[in-house]
Amino acid sequence: MKRIADEELVREERAEESTQKWLQDAKFQEILGADSSHKSLFVLLSHPDGSQGILLANKSPFSEEKSDIEKLLATAQLQEISRNDIFGSYNIEIDPKLNLLKSQLIYPINDRLIAKYRQEEKFVIRETPELYETVTRPYIEKYQLNLNWVYNCLEKRSEVDKIVFEDPDNENGFVLLQDIKWDGKTLENLYVLAICHRHGLKSVRDLTGDDLEMLYNMRDKSLEAINQKYGLKTDQIKCYFHYQPSFYHLHVHFINLKYDAPASTTMSAILLDDVINNLELNPEHYKKSTLTFTRKNGDKLMEMFREALKN
C-alpha cells in the first residue's frame, strides 16, 4: 500500500511540475471576463505549442483566525489616500501569504470552453417540456462537455484527497467532495459537491418521484458529513441545483450560507428542498413544468432556442 501511495505522490508531483512549466511558457491572449463582486478574473492564455488555456483567478476571502489577523496587523504597510478628521482611507500592503489567489488552470481547451467563460449579454429562456425534448436534449447529446473528470472522481482515480464522504450504493449513493473553487480550509466560503453514483441522470429535468429516496439520502448524509467534519449546522448550509448545470451528470451544490458563491443566487439556482417538495407534491413536476434560466448571447443553446422559436 505504501508503494502505491508513493507512486501516486510521484504522479501528482510530475503533474504539478508539468502544469507549472505550461503556465510559465504561456502568454496572455485576452481577458474573457471579470467579476468585481467575487474578485474574479478569467484570462485566456496561448502556448507556443499551439494549445490554449484559461486561468480562473479568485482572491481568497479573509481568514477569521486570530493568528492570521494578528499577522495581518503586524505586517500591514499603510499608504494614505485621504484623511478627514478621524476617518482615514488607505491602501494596505500585507504579507503575500495572507493574500493568495485561489486559481484554476484549464488546458488544453476548445472553443466551447472559451465561450463558457467569455462574458456576454444574457437573455431569459423559458423552456417548456416540449422545448426540452426538441432543443435542450439534442443540445446535451451533441455538445455536452466531456465527463471523464466526473467519472474519475466517482471511481477514485483522481481527487481522492478531496473526498469528504461517500455512500457507495449504486442506486442512491453519491460522492461528496470539495469543489475546485474551495481551498478546503476557509469555512467562510465552504463549497462542496455531491455527485450521484447513478449514471443517466443529467439534471433536475430527469428527476421524478422515484428519485426521492436518492435526494433524501444526498441531502441528509451530506449535511451530516459537513457538520461532523467542518462544524457547520444544517441551517448554515445552502444546498441547490443549477439549471442548466455546468456539466450534465446530476450533482448538488452545498455552500456556507455566508458565501455569495457564483450563480448561487441567480435564476439558475434551484434549492434542493424545493425540488424535493415539488416531487412530493407531483412526482412528474420536472417532466411537466416550464423551467426558466438564462443563457449568454452567442451561446450554442441560445442559438438553438432562437432558431426553434422562429418556426
Curated annotation (Swiss-Prot):
SUPFAM superfamilies xrefs: HIT-like, mRNA decapping enzyme DcpS N-terminal domain
Motif position, Histidine triad motif: 249-253
Tissue specificity: Expressed in neurons in the ventral cord, the nerve ring and the pharynx.
Pfam families: DcpS, DcpS_C
Reactions catalysed: a 5'-end (N(7)-methyl 5'-triphosphoguanosine)-ribonucleoside in mRNA + H2O = N(7)-methyl-GMP + a 5'-end diphospho-ribonucleoside in mRNA + 2 H(+); a 5'-end (N(2),N(2),N(7)-trimethyl 5'-triphosphoguanosine)-ribonucleoside in mRNA + H2O = (N(2),N(2),N(7))-trimethyl-GMP + a 5'-end diphospho-ribonucleoside in mRNA + 2 H(+)
Main localization of the protein described in the UniProt heading: nucleus
Active site: 251
One GO term (biological process): response to heat
This protein's record includes keyword Nucleus: yes
GO molecular function: 5'-(N(7)-methyl 5'-triphosphoguanosine)-[mRNA] diphosphatase activity; adenylylsulfatase activity; RNA 7-methylguanosine cap binding; sulfate adenylyltransferase (ADP) activity
Gene Ontology CC annotation, any one: cytoplasm
Family, as annotated: Belongs to the HIT family.
Protein name: m7GpppX diphosphatase
Gene: dcs-1
